[in-house]
């Protein structure tokens, strides 16, 4: 009888050798994808402008993950922070990609070997002579090894004791670099934006995993617990493994979308909440105010704003602006950023400074409204000019730029003023090259958005998978109609009363 496509995994249900083979093949596929994807991204990645055309604007997905773990140089002679590199070393982007591909090939061969030589003595129960796995013991081994890896990452890789450290930056994503991180053992270690928490939590979790692994290797589960949780059933392993995966997927979806020390904005782009809360705008105004307090002119104060900080304060870098089903990188949407034009300051004919209301995240269009410092509407771009009271022409609005390429330039032509007012809705104004990539002008999401969507979606699917397989293994007797603990064959003649074990016939 042929199996339907959704039942094919039953062939490894009672076959430990081939169960191992398919898992090794799965590892080969994952490692092979990672290495191949890294090489593809390196082939299309342009490292020439890390400020206005960073990896997240170009839609890079695996390069940011390598970078946050300490890989910053390429055999192509460039570094992720700019400049040329003479000796990138073996653990460059290409070196890591190649290692994954070699590892994938070895796993591929190992999977084939274990598929062919499936009937190994190690998988045979000495008492019964049938294929069998000591699942509680295997659980202990896996827990111990995972604990060692977790502890090693936190104690050696992150701290720099034996490793490069991790990517660490300031709260505004301006000074990021790979550096050693000391564990944070105090309450500050629970702050998701404190890098020291990464080291301390991995050390603590790894220690717990090692101890728990040793416990499960040395202590057998009680019979009642073993039977109650179906510890001898491979589908129990599947169910609990799926639970671990969906839980991890939900966690990383949250740390990616809301931001954390593990997802620096220099590598994955800003979060939508930084736009919603005017996070970068407030920092820019704070710096300008500090400059003015030091007797700098408005032009000097704005000219000292880093272009990188101004670029974060642009709605096109908001991951929630791009539709989930708009394929392509951010550069394919609004174009490649070329330069900051400067900060526009609008004034009416009475000399009041006016502020353009910024577009909220989930609006595609938004009325152009200019308010004064008290929040009173002073000018707008009306829908119906016949009924307008605050049009740019009537109010006599002018615009002057401070900092950037248009520093010191002013305009009083209403058409030009309205053009820059519309663009000021989107945050700081940048010159964007749409010709190079034939960009269509429609916003795209960043890798932060794609990662979150993918992991949240799969976490939901895996959650239902956990419920499904957990129910199947816990209630196997109900679904199959067979009590797994029934040790006597229920047949006519075995008992005086059919099915009643208390009336078993005595053999004379």
Swiss-Prot record:
GO molecular function, one term: electron transporter, transferring electrons within the cyclic electron transport pathway of photosynthesis activity
Lipoprotein in keyword set: no
Membrane-spanning residues: 21-36, 101-115, 140-156, 203-218, 237-252, 457-472
Cofactor mode of binding and number, as noted: Binds multiple chlorophylls. PSII binds additional chlorophylls, carotenoids and specific lipids.
Listed GO biological process terms: photosynthetic electron transport in photosystem II
Pfam families named in the record: PSII
Membrane topology: Multi-pass membrane protein
Keywords associated with the record: Chlorophyll, Chloroplast, Chromophore, Membrane, Photosynthesis, Photosystem II, Plastid, Thylakoid, Transmembrane, Transmembrane helix
Compartments, record wording: Plastid, Chloroplast thylakoid membrane
InterPro entries: PS_antenna-like (IPR000932), PS_II_antenna-like_sf (IPR036001), PSII_PsbB (IPR017486)
Gene Ontology cellular-component terms listed: chloroplast thylakoid membrane; photosystem II
Known partners and oligomeric status: PSII is composed of 1 copy each of membrane proteins PsbA, PsbB, PsbC, PsbD, PsbE, PsbF, PsbH, PsbI, PsbJ, PsbK, PsbL, PsbM, PsbT, PsbX, PsbY, PsbZ, Psb30/Ycf12, at least 3 peripheral proteins of the oxygen-evolving complex and a large number of cofactors. It forms dimeric complexes.
HAMAP family: PSII_PsbB_CP47
Protein function: One of the components of the core complex of photosystem II (PSII). It binds chlorophyll and helps catalyze the primary light-induced photochemical processes of PSII. PSII is a light-driven water:plastoquinone oxidoreductase, using light energy to abstract electrons from H(2)O, generating O(2) and a proton gradient subsequently used for ATP formation.
Family: Belongs to the PsbB/PsbC family. PsbB subfamily.
UniProt name for this protein: Photosystem II CP47 reaction center protein
Organism: Trachelium caeruleum
Gene: psbB
């Amino acid at each position: 009888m042929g199996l339907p496509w959704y039942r094919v995994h039953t062939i490894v249900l009672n076959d430990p050798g081939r169960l191992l083979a398919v898992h090794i093949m799965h590892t080969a596929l994952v490692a092979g994808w990672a290495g191949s994807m890294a090489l593809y991204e390196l082939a299309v990645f342009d490292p020439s402008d890390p400020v206005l055309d960073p990896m997240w604007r170009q839609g890079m997905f695996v390069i940011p993950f390598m970078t946050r773990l300490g890989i910053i140089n390429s055999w192509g002679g460039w570094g992720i922070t700019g400049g040329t590199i003479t000796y990138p070393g073996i653990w460059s982007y290409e070196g890591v990609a190649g290692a994954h591909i070699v590892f994938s090939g070895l796993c591929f061969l190992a999977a084939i070997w274990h598929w062919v030589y499936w009937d190994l003595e190690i998988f045979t129960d000495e008492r019964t002579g049938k294929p069998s796995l000591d699942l509680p013991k295997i659980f202990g081994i896996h827990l111990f090894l995972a604990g060692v890896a977790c502890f090693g990452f936190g104690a050696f890789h992150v701290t720099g004791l034996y490793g490069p450290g991790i990517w660490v930056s300031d709260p505004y994503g301006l000074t990021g670099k790979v550096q050693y991180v000391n564990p944070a053992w105090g309450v500050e270690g629970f702050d998701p934006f404190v890098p020291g928490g990464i080291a301390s939590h991995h050390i603590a979790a790894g220690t717990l995993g090692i101890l728990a692994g040793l416990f499960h290797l040395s202590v057998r589960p009680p019979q009642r617990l073993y039977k109650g949780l179906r510890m001898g059933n491979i589908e129990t392993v599947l169910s609990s493994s799926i639970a671990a995966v969906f839980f991890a997927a939900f966690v990383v979806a949250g740390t990616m979308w809301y931001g954390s020390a593990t997802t620096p904005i220099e590598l994955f782009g800003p979060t939508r909440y930084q736009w919603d809360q005017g996070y970068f705008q407030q920092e820019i105004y704070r710096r300008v105010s500090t400059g003015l307090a030091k007797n700098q002119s408005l032009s000097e104060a704005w000219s000292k704003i880093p272009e990188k900080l101004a670029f974060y304060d642009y709605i096109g870098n908001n991951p929630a602006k791009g539709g989930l089903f708009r394929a392509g990188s951010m550069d394919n949407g609004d174009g490649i950023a070329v330069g900051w034009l400067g900060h526009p300051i609008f004034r009416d004919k009475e000399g009041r400074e006016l502020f353009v209301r910024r577009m909220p995240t989930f609006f595609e269009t938004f009325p152009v409204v200019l308010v004064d410092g008290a929040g009173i509407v002073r000018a707008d771009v009306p829908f119906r000019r016949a009924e307008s009271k605050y049009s740019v022409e009537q109010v006599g609005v002018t615009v002057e730029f401070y900092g950037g390429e248009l520093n010191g330039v002013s305009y009083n032509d209403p058409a030009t003023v309205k053009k820059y007012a519309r663009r000021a809705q989107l945050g700081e104004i940048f010159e964007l090259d749409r010709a190079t990539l034939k960009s269509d002008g429609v916003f795209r999401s960043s890798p932060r958005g794609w990662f979150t969507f993918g992991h949240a979606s799969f976490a939901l699917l895996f959650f239902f998978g956990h419920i499904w397989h957990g129910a199947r293994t816990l209630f196997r007797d109900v679904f199959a109609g067979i009590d797994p603990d029934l040790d006597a064959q229920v047949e006519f003649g075995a008992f005086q009363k059919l099915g009643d074990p208390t009336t078993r016939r005595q053999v004379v």
